């Protein structure tokens, strides 16, 4: 047996290990079924080695198989070769690593942009939610996982990375260069829709955000404000712990979320009455750019009937991943648990369905109409600083207008 063949055999063993370990995630209920599939894999590997038209590069063949194996599970699971993992680890351990400000997934086989942080390198380069990346740094995204894509987009601050962007109405991808930067924590934009409605615009749920929201709510009560809007559009970052802590500011009883996985102990996150700060009316704004921790918050509010969730269905990306290193120096990013709403439905892929569905309209499109003749436009309360995030809400923002309408509607009288 030559060196290449021996390497292929070892690689096949790695695949067997991975397959056996995650077989249940794929829905296989017995080891026999898993190993039958492995037998087929071994036969295919042998035929490639012996019968392929040219002498195959078995490292490439096996790496491709492993990438495909992980990607077949879900959009967030990834496989890193030893070289890829070494690069990933260096960037992960470097606090000065530059980023682009994107939250990514995969759709239609390509990498797709879920959300873009305001004033981030990606936003400055003209990248928008919904953009499809055909390529990143010259590599086709149909052949890469979300983990690989994210790793390619990170690097030394001040350096650029080119992406090929597929956009509606254009036959060829646009070549766009994004210059990486060290990102600063996103600030919460505080606005007033009118004297009685506070608007908190969240573009991330960074550590400490729930405490910041608590302080704003307490301040609002002292000012005689009785209604709140939480804008979760473009909110795709932050730990779920912040979503749970935020939900507890509004929900006095019941379940907020449940975390379940094959090897993860079930965790039930419950409301805590002593943590409630706001008992008045509240509405949340969501759309397809709402993902991750923000979805856990939105689902808790919907399921506990704590207020209206207005807008569009969220993306569906609430899960937990684990980094697993392998003996050959490669690594897996494996989804090990999903978050479920209080009704027991998985948020992953399904997303959160709003209580009031309103089609999202891009603010730029609305502003281009030049209309400003109705509805109370929020008055910005914080200094006009680009680092604070997005611009003040437009009165032509249909999702915002509907939420304001619901909050200001007179209470429905109960039948006698």
What does each of the following model-derived ranges do?
Residues 110, 184, 206, 256, ...:
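Active-site/binding-pocket entry motifs
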Residues 331, 338-416:
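Conserved functional hotspot residues or short segments at active or partner-binding sites
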Residues 29-51, 72-110, 362-386:
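Glycine-biased strand-turn-strand hairpin within the trypsin-fold
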Residues 2-78, 111, 398-402, 406, ...:
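Terminal targeting/pro-maturation regions of precursor/exported proteins
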Residues 52-114, 158-162, 166-177, 183-190, ...:
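Extended, small/polar residue-biased N-terminal targeting/export presequences
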Residues 322-338:
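Surface-exposed, non-catalytic interaction/assembly patches
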Residues 25-37, 46-53, 57-58, 112-115, ...:
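Cleft-lining beta-strand/loop regions that shape enzyme active-site pockets
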């Amino acid at each position: 047996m030559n060196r290449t063949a021996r390497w292929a055999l070892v690689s096949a063993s790695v695949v067997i290990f991975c397959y056996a370990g995650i077989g249940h995630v794929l829905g296989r209920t017995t080891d026999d079924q898993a190993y039958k599939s492995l037998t087929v894999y071994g036969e295919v590997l042998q035929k490639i080695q012996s019968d392929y038209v040219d002498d195959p590069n078995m490292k490439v063949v096996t790496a491709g198989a492993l990438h495909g194996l992980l990607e077949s599970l879900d959009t967030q699971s990834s496989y890193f070769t030893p070289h890829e993992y070494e690069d990933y680890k260096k960037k992960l351990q470097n606090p000065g690593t530059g980023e682009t400000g994107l939250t990514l997934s995969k759709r239609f086989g390509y990498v797709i942009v879920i959300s873009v942080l305001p004033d981030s390198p990606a936003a400055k380069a003209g990248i928008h939610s919904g953009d499809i990346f055909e390529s990143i740094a010259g590599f086709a995204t149909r052949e890469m996982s979300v983990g690989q894509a994210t790793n390619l987009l990170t690097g030394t601050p001040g350096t650029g990375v080119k992406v090929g962007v597929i956009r509606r109405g254009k036959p060829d991808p646009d070549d766009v260069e994004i210059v990486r930067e060290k990102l600063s924590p996103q600030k919460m934009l505080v606005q007033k829709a009118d004297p009685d409605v506070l608007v908190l615009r969240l573009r991330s749920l960074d550590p400490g955000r729930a405490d910041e929201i608590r302080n704003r709510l307490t301040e609002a009560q002292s000012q005689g404000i009785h209604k709140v809007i939480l804008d979760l559009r473009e909110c795709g970052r932050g730990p779920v712990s912040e979503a749970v802590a935020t939900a507890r500011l509004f929900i006095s009883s019941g379940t907020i979320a449940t975390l379940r996985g094959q090897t993860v102990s079930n965790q039930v996150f419950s409301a805590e009455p002593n943590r409630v700060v706001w008992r008045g009316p509240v509405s949340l704004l969501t759309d397809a750019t709402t993902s991750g921790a923000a979805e856990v918050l939105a689902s808790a509010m919907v399921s506990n009937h704590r207020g209206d969730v207005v807008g569009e269905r969220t993306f569906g990306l609430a899960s937990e991943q684990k980094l697993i290193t392998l003996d050959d120096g490669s690594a897996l990013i494996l989804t090990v648990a999903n978050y479920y709403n209080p009704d027991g439905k998985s948020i992953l892929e399904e997303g959160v369905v709003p209580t009031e569905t309103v089609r999202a309209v891009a603010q730029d499109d609305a502003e281009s109409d030049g209309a400003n003749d109705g509805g109370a436009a929020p008055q910005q309360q914080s200094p006009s600083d680009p680092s604070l995030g997005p611009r003040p809400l437009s009165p032509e923002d249909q999702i915002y207008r509907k939420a304001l309408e619901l909050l200001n509607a007179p209470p429905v009288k109960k039948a006698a």
